[in-house]
């Protein structure tokens, strides 16, 4: 660290296991004129704790039951409503979405998180040393990107080392040691100038103790070449990842609140969508609604894709007009105190508030896929069996619509349905939108993932492999079973991405024979449909944390028939 840099940390003592969490703020750059503020701001400012509900604890997982046969799709595409609708109502928030984040006083459960990591490390003593992320300025500038820390080290802001009147003038007061102790369940907080002495003392008092680092670059001069301690850079990352798979009651409360805010913002978009002319308006309203409710940070960049853009899984331009298009896919969620939500709704476009016939067919199919999968969530279930269930429902629905043709078993064996359902059913959610899975994979033991993508890519070959794995039965090595305390998304979708379908599937005889091009051409303008909720696995089933309306409830709001 350069002279004058300010570094803060919090120390957590849990019996004989010490977890040391360091938050770093560095003012850098050749021409920076901003005083080193050392605010040690966490990844999302204003970290706080919420009142806890009943704890949701991880319990022994029963043996996986045989994969149930996906239910047959016994209802055809529903009729499309027509007729005049009343004008859109004024945007007066109703009680159901009048959600505003309030500052709480209960403590962040730092000791519990440290204890979970210690348990995964199988360690009764040791030191976890976690440097935080530095804040930086652009080269030759006094400005820089918004500060965001590694999700694994997000924490409350500890006290500054050198608070001066000038720093207060520029940046305001930072939390005192007393403030930090009041905000977090920790036993001791010190100023950063005490860190070298603390580490030297620890090494002398705990001869041959293990110091756990995420990687060697995160060490400290007081630890380098210190013969009194053993440095372990291999065990901490998998232990922390596994500890994050099941959430504490405090974490669940934060995810629930993030979903409440996001659901209210989605509802606001529904009330306005008939008056909007561009994707920009949709994205702007969503983020504004989150901000005024106290959750200004988005868990990921909002996706507001209309028409063909709805077929791009991670569309981000959000800059095209809505006129003449069938649907808008709005995939957007805020975060609260670093915990994410991830919510997707598909809205009809146009003045009537009704889906076009083709869009309604696809929406109803995706709705059936999601409802069946959510209803099946329970402890002990292999999550990837839900993906197969959704794929089977999609196959039968696309056969019924005539987009697919031929023998159902032959189409399934070829994996052709992946042309239209090309991504995984969902993912963990928590400190990150696409949260860590721990030692096992939620969906694929080894699969392609786009950089920074939220979804596993599922090719036809991967789908066939998943089905074969279920058919051969246990052991399910590397496949993750659902456990109480997990929060996962369930987000099936059907897409008509012309480049993808024609670039891969229509070029191969084994797929081309099962796709009716004439019928497919009628559905290309739909673009795509996705519906996504965040689902908490409970001891006896599940809780849907996402309250954004969908289906007929959504359509009534869009048409101004309900709030």
Swiss-Prot record:
Protein name per Swiss-Prot or TrEMBL:
Probable Xaa-Pro aminopeptidase PEPP
Alphabetical list of PANTHER family matching this protein: XAA-PRO AMINOPEPTIDASE 3, XAA-PRO AMINOPEPTIDASE AN0832-RELATED
Q: What does the record say about how the cofactor binds?
A: Binds 2 manganese ions per subunit.
For binding Mn(2+) 2, which residues are annotated in this chain's numbering?
Answer: 331, 342, 532
User: Which BP terms from GO are recorded?
Assistant: proteolysis
Protein's UniProt keywords contain Repressor = no
The Swiss-Prot or TrEMBL record annotates one GO molecular function as:
metallopeptidase activity
Source organism lineage?
Eukaryota, Fungi, Dikarya, Ascomycota, Pezizomycotina
Origin organism is Verticillium alfalfae (strain VaMs.102 / ATCC MYA-4576 / FGSC 10136) (Verticillium wilt of alfalfa)
Similarity remark: Belongs to the peptidase M24B family.
Question: What are the UniProt keywords, alphabetically?
Answer: Aminopeptidase, Hydrolase, Manganese, Metal-binding, Metalloprotease, Protease
Required co-factors: Mn(2+)
EC assignment: 3.4.11.9
| Its job | Catalyzes the removal of a penultimate prolyl residue from the N-termini of peptides.
Annotated residues for binding of Mn(2+) 1: 342, 491, 532
Q: What class of enzyme is it?
A: hydrolase
What's the catalysed reaction?
Release of any N-terminal amino acid, including proline, that is linked to proline, even from a dipeptide or tripeptide
Could you tell me which Gene3D superfamilies the record lists for this protein?
Answer: Creatinase/methionine aminopeptidase superfamily (3.90.230.10), Creatinase/prolidase N-terminal domain (3.40.350.10)
Keyword Manganese found: yes
